Each structure stands twice: as C-alpha cells, then as structure tokens.
C-alpha cells in the first residue's frame, strides 16, 4: 500500500520540493557538470563562459590549488607542479604509474599509494581529483542558486574496485554526496534517450582523453541492461598525442628534453592532432626546429591504437552473445571520437553509420544529470531502470589453493550472492576468508582483494559447521563480504577498500590467460581437488585409528597402515590417476573398519534402550 504524506494546510512538504542534483563527467582531459532544468539536461557554464573545465590542477607555492583554464597556463612554465590527466593515476600503485612514458612529475611511493611531490606539498591523486570536483561543485551551486542534494559521477565502465573507490573518496573530500557512480557508456545511452525508442541492442563506443570503454546494452520492457563491457582505462586521446610526440622527437633527432620542453611538445602535439581532423597536415616549431606531419602519416600511426579498441569491441560483442547485425545503434562518446579515422573504422566494423549528433564531450554529463534528477526524487524512475555489470569474477580461496567463483564476470549489478562452506578439521574454531578477483582456477593466478578471519566457530566434527559467505556488490560496483556461522550465529564482515587496483593491461591479461590456460587450469584444479581429498581421508583415518585401533587385529591394522602410507606418499604428486587409485585402495581396505566403528557407535547408543523406543 502506498504511503501518503500528510502536512498542514498551506505548508509544502519537503518531500515534494525540487532537489538540486547534478551529473558530473570527471574526465581525463576535461570535466563537465550538468543539471536538469525545466525538463532539459543542460551543461552548466563556468565563469569564463565555457562549459568545459580542463582537468588540470596547478599546485602553487602559496598552498593554493588552481583548477581549469587558469591552471593550464602553468603547464608550459611549471610542468612539475601542473598535474594533467590525474584520472590515469586514480587507484594505481607506485609500481604501475612508474611505467608511464614521459611523465614530468616527481612521484613518491607511500605504501601502495602514489603521491605527487609539488610546491603545495605531497598530494595524492584523490586529493587532486577532489579539487577538480570542488570546482565543479562551486560552479553548480552558483548556477543553480543553492546547496546541492547530491551528484551522479561517471566512471569508465572498466574501472575496477580501487578506481571506483578512489573516485568516491575524492567526491567526499570535495564535500559532494555521491548518489551513484554511473558507467560512462550507460550515461551516454540515457542522454540519447534510447529508452524512449524501440527495444533492441545498442553499442556505446567511448574513447576519451585517457580511457576507452565499449558497452553492449539491451533495452527491453523499460529495463536498460548492460550485456557486456570491455575497455582499457589507460588508452585514450593522450596516447594519440604521444604518437605525434614520439614522431616529433624521432624526426628532429632530439636526445633529451627538460620537463618544460616536453610539456610544450605535448601541447603542440594535441593541437596538431585536432588540426589533422580537418586539414591535410599540421606543423609547429619545437626547440628552434620545425616539425611537420601529414594526415596520412598520422592515420597510419593511429590505426594501431584504433585496432586495439576494435579488438576490445569484438570481445564485448562476443561476451554479449549477439551478432554485429543485431546492434541497432552505435553511439560515439568522448572527444577522441571526433577523429575521422575513428568514426570510419568503427562504422566499417558495424557496417552502418555511427551516431554522433550530441556533442561527444557533453553527452556523458547530460546523461548523468538525468539519472541524478531521478535519484534525487525529482522524476519517477518508472521510465527506465539501469542495470550495469561486473567486469571480473569474484570468489574465495578454498583448500588446495583453489578459487571458488561466487559472482561471475558480466553478472548484472547490484547483486547479493551467498555460498555455504564448512570446516576442514575436527574442532576447527576459526576460518580465514580470502577474497579474490579474476578468471583463473588457482589463487596464485588471481588478484587478492582482502583477507579476514571468522572467529568463534563452535568446535565440532570436520564438515559439520555451516558457514555462509555472502558477497554484495552495490550499484557503484563496490564489494562487501560477510561470513556467518549458521549454528552459533557468529558473524563478521568487511567492505573491500583496496589501496590500488588493476591496470586494464592486467585485466586484459587475466581474461586472455583464463581462455589460453582454460584446459590446463581445469586439469590443475582436478589434481588439487584430488590432493585435498587424499589429505582429508588420511586425517580421518589417523583420527579413527587413534580412537579405535584396539578393534583391529594385527593383519587388518598392517593392511590399513600400508594403504595409508601408499596414499601419503602419493598425495603430493602430480599423478592424479595414481592418487585416485591409492585413495580408492585405502577406502576399500578400511571398509570393514568403518563398518565395525559404525556398529560399535550404534550399540553404545542403544545400551539401556529397547528397539521399540527408536
């Protein structure tokens, strides 16, 4: 039954007041903020009359952080203190970012985190991103004329748990309430109003300044469901700029550059790339030398990167279990899709024209604003339901170093899934829970997310305890895990907040390896399972002999001990067939002993009772 809101005559219920909600596209190169006004999603304008805020932060000596266009002016004169493309550093470890080419910043290692050594002080990627978000928040509050209820912030669909958590942390630091983290391709689909069109399958090709995402979505009966996602959070417009940078350095025979010179070449290269979208050549002066590149040469260089995006696109189509012909629309998102070659090659893959009628820089922010307006309660969500998916499988370590998958890759989120486990040894009073991410069968081949212990399990016979472990992934793609011993009610839980995450090169490798080593992994898993069963049987026999050895005559005891020794010697070998043979031999040898113990237990239970009582 619906609840009615009752208020005094003349009073307006707060529940019906319009709440100020915004959508934020926190981009690698540029960031935007949008809001729904008079039923239309509009990108808000900053003080300089621009809708785009460059994702650039200058860290000055006076502890002042300058954001946007004003910060960008410092890039040539003070490159080590001017942080550009900070999104690439979100959720990354020091080891991972140390491989970035031509990085002008002084980076410090702080545990698993990375710090930028600047004139302002040592700052994390989260703190720098927070200053960008704070600037967007200030712009929104000024434009909308009031305090914000909250924001929907977009992230690449292929952002992992660490990168998503880092984004939420940055929002909190900026004083923003995160209503939801929304995948960028999903936001684009909302902006294009696909939910108001015919039912069908759509592809969202999102090539931004530093990230690439491809999402295959279906729309049916009011539900937007992400069928599959793929991408690379370290591939974007910056990499196309780098092609020109490298060609310039090679062509002009430059051996060494100062950080200031490198930053100038990067800016010139970006301008040259944009020029080549409409002209046959571009040129600029570099260290008193003239550099020239033709459109034809740039496209030859760029094809390699575009082909990488198309391989990921094909994989997403395969994962979605649809054919190219089934896809109705291909939406182009991100500033890098302005390159004519990108549009041509994507159109050629799908054999149909691509959609790019909405400004590719603004489409994500507009979609996020529409979703924020719904989540703020300003508009019914009855029109459309958004369902995203998980990029990698989540599971637990079991005996023998095996991984038991709890939630599989490309499962729709939010989701709660539980699985029951038990104890391995008699009298076991604690269990270590090891949460993993990946597609392989063994712990050593997957990524560790967290470990925690469930203490206070009542001591009982091995296999008697019932421990339910529950995985919960929220709408933001963040994971929490709980463990409950069903008999005693003992419970513990953890929210996974990793200090750094996987690069998409690592993600790609994990997925490729899961296919490449699928047969070997299954064989290895079967071997490990047999080894675990052998050790479990040996422990059970040892315990039985300790209690009831007196039941056996010398011959039976010697036969059991001989069979046990054979299995013990084979238990750690790589010969699964031999282990199974030895295991079967021990079980057959012990069958009479098992029967004797069972009869003895029954006789003890019946002492002093009649059969009729049972």
UniProtKB/Swiss-Prot annotation:
Disulfide bonds: none annotated. Keywords: ATP-binding, Chaperone, Nucleotide-binding. PROSITE patterns: HSP70_1, HSP70_2. SUPFAM superfamilies: Actin-like ATPase domain (SSF53067), Heat shock protein 70kD (HSP70), C-terminal subdomain (SSF100934), Heat shock protein 70kD (HSP70), peptide-binding domain (SSF100920). GO terms for biological process: iron-sulfur cluster assembly. It comes from the Bacteria. The keyword Nucleotide-binding applies. It holds the Pfam family HSP70. GO terms for molecular function: ATP binding; ATP hydrolysis activity; ATP-dependent protein folding chaperone; unfolded protein binding. Chaperone involved in the maturation of iron-sulfur cluster-containing proteins. Has a low intrinsic ATPase activity which is markedly stimulated by HscB. Belongs to the heat shock protein 70 family. This is Chaperone protein HscA homolog. It comes from Ruthia magnifica subsp. Calyptogena magnifica. The lineage of its organism: Bacteria, Pseudomonadati, Pseudomonadota, Gammaproteobacteria, Candidatus Pseudothioglobaceae.
